[in-house]
Amino acid sequence: NVVVLATGGTIAGAGTNAFASQXGPLGMVVEGK
């Protein structure tokens, strides 16, 4: 379950950080990167 943010970042769903952010500072923050 990956949600693409307006910033260009992504959130890996289902309680996992397995997916790296595709750029985008907000996505990185939400993923805890």
From Swiss-Prot:
Specify the Asparaginase/glutaminase domain's residue ranges.
1-33
Q: Which GO terms describe its molecular function?
A: asparaginase activity; glutamin-(asparagin-)ase activity; glutaminase activity
List its EC numbers: 3.5.1.38
Indicate yes or no for the key word Transmembrane helix. no
Catalysed reaction per UniProt?
L-glutamine + H2O = L-glutamate + NH4(+); L-asparagine + H2O = L-aspartate + NH4(+)
Q: Determine if Manganese is one of this entry's keywords.
A: no
Active site (UniProt): 10
**Which GO biological process categories is it annotated with?**
amino acid metabolic process
Q: Which UniProt keywords apply?
A: Hydrolase, Periplasm
What are the record's GO terms for cellular component? periplasmic space
Q: Which domain of life is it from?
A: Bacteria
Per its UniProt record, what InterPro entries does this chain match?
Asparaginase/glutaminase-like (IPR006034), Asparaginase/glutaminase_AS1 (IPR020827)
Induction comment from the UniProt entry of this chain: Repressed during growth on high concentrations of 2,4-dichlorophenoxypropionic acid (2,4-DCPP).
Kindly list the places in or outside the cell where this protein is found, as annotated in its UniProt entry.
Periplasm
The UniProt similarity line reads: Belongs to the asparaginase 1 family.
Assembly and interaction partners: Homotetramer.
Protein's name in the database: Glutaminase-asparaginase
Q: Which organism is it from?
A: Delftia acidovorans (Pseudomonas acidovorans)
Per UniProt, what is the name of the gene that codes for the protein in this document?
ansB
